[in-house]
């Protein structure tokens, strides 16, 4: 069932109209402590004490991916109504005043309460996957963590120049970074982070979605294998009956791809109930968020946020939230609402991150160079 039917659209509009959900600026390009001109790439976690912590690229000089970038965070203790406690959680290497950057954060909260953040790091110009034909020498993946709910953060830990930290990295790797957004902790305690990897294959640079996982609270990581389709990249995963289900960006089909693994990413196959069911329009694909919740009937629900991109290119308009009922797949994919019913900024927009805890659902999303938050618990309550 392809989303976007008239009945689903009417349903979503009714939710939006009836609730008139206010948007709150978390990172404001017009007014911020860093004098940053642009913010991108939201990640968000709701903590055990009910506070919400949001993360963003601090793109000091503008939207460009290849610029001077740090990663910052903000906290809300009132359900997202107000935000404060702004701080930098990961600095770039300070090697190049134009190009040094850490960016595209992915976060997870472990069973011990540790918040882990992983990000890609570079110090030269150029695309992460296409600029070099061999392992890129200025690239690394860095990790920081907090054991006090984000009040203080560790120094950076380099995962990629120390082979004891990351296992099963392919010899033909150009580079990799995490999938952008959030990871999960499986029922057995395994931490799984979405990832994307660029590989040299038959003298061509290709990129794919994958995962990394840790069984020791993030001390060491193992890389899974790539999904079957190239031009997949940013993704998020959920656990269902011990399997991993992935919803992934795809830059060639105009739809989000979906895969399932029953062996912790060793092998993947297409997950038909979700594959190519969410349209992302003509042109480049886009990052999207994917989380699992349980509704009042006890059904396990997958929630996806992604732009419709009806205007094509990099406009990435109408960031929309969809649902799939894993316990009643006959329902197909339904549209729940459109938290950002506007055009994106074609210089950088369309990304989002969902977070759910204790019956409260929130979304952080890109809004013309700022990051906004909405409490969309009404979407969750509408699921039946």
How would you label these PLM feature ranges?
Residues 15-384:
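Asp-box/BNR beta-propeller blade signature and adjacent active/binding-site loops
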Residues 2-17:
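Sec-dependent signal peptide cleavage junction
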């Amino acid at each position: 069932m392809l989303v976007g039917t008239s009945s689903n659209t009417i349903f979503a509009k009714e939710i939006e109209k009836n609730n008139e959900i206010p948007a709150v600026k978390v990172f404001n390009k017009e007014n911020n402590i860093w004098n940053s001109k642009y913010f991108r790439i939201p990640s968000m976690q709701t903590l055990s004490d009910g506070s919400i912590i949001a993360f963003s690229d601090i793109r000091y000089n503008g939207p460009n991916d290849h610029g001077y970038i740090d990663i910052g965070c903000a906290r809300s203790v009132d359900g997202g109504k107000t935000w404060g406690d702004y701080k930098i959680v990961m600095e770039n290497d300070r090697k190049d005043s134009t190009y040094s950057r850490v960016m595209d954060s992915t976060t997870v909260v472990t069973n011990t309460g540790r918040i882990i953040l992983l990000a890609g790091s570079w110090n030269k110009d150029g695309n992460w996957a296409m600029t070099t034909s061999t392992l890129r020498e200025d690239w690394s993946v860095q990790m920081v963590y907090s054991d006090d709910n984000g009040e203080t953060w560790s120094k950076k830990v380099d995962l990629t120049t120390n082979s004891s930290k990351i296992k099963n990295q392919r010899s033909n790797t150009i580079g990799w970074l995490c999938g952008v957004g959030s990871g999960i902790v499986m029922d057995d305690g395994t931490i799984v982070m979405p990832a994307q990897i660029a590989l040299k294959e038959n003298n061509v640079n290709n990129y794919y979605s994958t995962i990394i996982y840790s069984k020791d609270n993030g001390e060491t990581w193992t890389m899974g294998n790539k999904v079957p389709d190239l031009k997949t990249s940013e993704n998020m995963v959920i656990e269902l009956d011990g399997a991993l289900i992935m919803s992934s960006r795809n830059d060639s089909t105009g739809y989000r791809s979906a895969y399932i693994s029953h062996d912790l990413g060793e092998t993947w196959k297409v997950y038909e109930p979700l594959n190519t069911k969410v349209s992302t329009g003509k042109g480049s694909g886009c990052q999207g968020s994917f989380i699992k919740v349980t509704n009042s009937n006890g059904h396990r629900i997958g929630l996806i946020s992604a732009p419709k991109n009806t205007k094509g290119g990099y406009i990435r308009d109408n960031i929309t939230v969809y649902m799939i009922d894993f316990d009643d797949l006959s329902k197909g994919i339904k549209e729940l609402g459109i938290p950002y019913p506007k055009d994106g900024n074609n210089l950088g927009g369309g990304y989002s991150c969902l977070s759910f805890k204790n019956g409260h659902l929130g979304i952080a999303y890109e809004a013309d160079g700022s990051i906004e938050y909405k409490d969309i618990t009404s979407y969750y309550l509408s699921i039946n």
